[in-house]
Amino acid sequence: MNISLKRVAFPALICSAFLLSACGNKNTEHSDEVTPEDKVMQELSSEAIRNFDKTPNDQHDILLLVDYDNRYTQVSDEMEDELIKLSKSGDLTAEFSYTRKKDNLVSASEMLKNLDLKTEQGRYIQGLIAGYWDQQLKLLEQHKDKTLNDKSLSEDKLKGLGGYLHAQDQLENW
């Protein structure tokens, strides 16, 4: 009985080794390929939080940036709700969608630039967010003729989002 077990076990072990090595080679061959999920994760990866010296104006800038974020979020949510409602009713045109989104981005950018930030950290966060809005405006210009439901527009919205998320993390850490 021992001899037959050895005869079966040894070939099974060899076959298993070959199968595992073949699977391992296949994985290493494809590891250079960047999957869509990898692209999303790369875009969303955020820089490390930068440390800034504390200043007497920190609270002032924090309040301004939080207020800005709350006001922008409210206006943006209302605009998105309006576009979704129009899309569902079949009344949404690419031109109207483009105009509303552009107005929203320009307004967000102008509101941000008009903040009277007094600290280096506040201006750093302001710059990160402004860079994101500039990127979104460029993308919007490239996709003028697309509506809310267009898949390529949704994928492009992720571009530059890492900087925006870093700004949010930086503000939250502050």
Where are the model-predicted features located?
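Stable alpha-helical elements in mature extracytoplasmic
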Residues: 40, 61-64, 68, 75, ...
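Extended amphipathic alpha-helical scaffold segments
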Residues: 45-46, 76-83, 101-112, 140, ...
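Long, amphipathic, charge-rich alpha-helical segments that form helical bundles/coiled-coils
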Residues: 97-157
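Short, low-complexity, Pro/Ser/Thr/Gly-rich segments in the mature regions of secreted, periplasmic
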Residues: 160-174
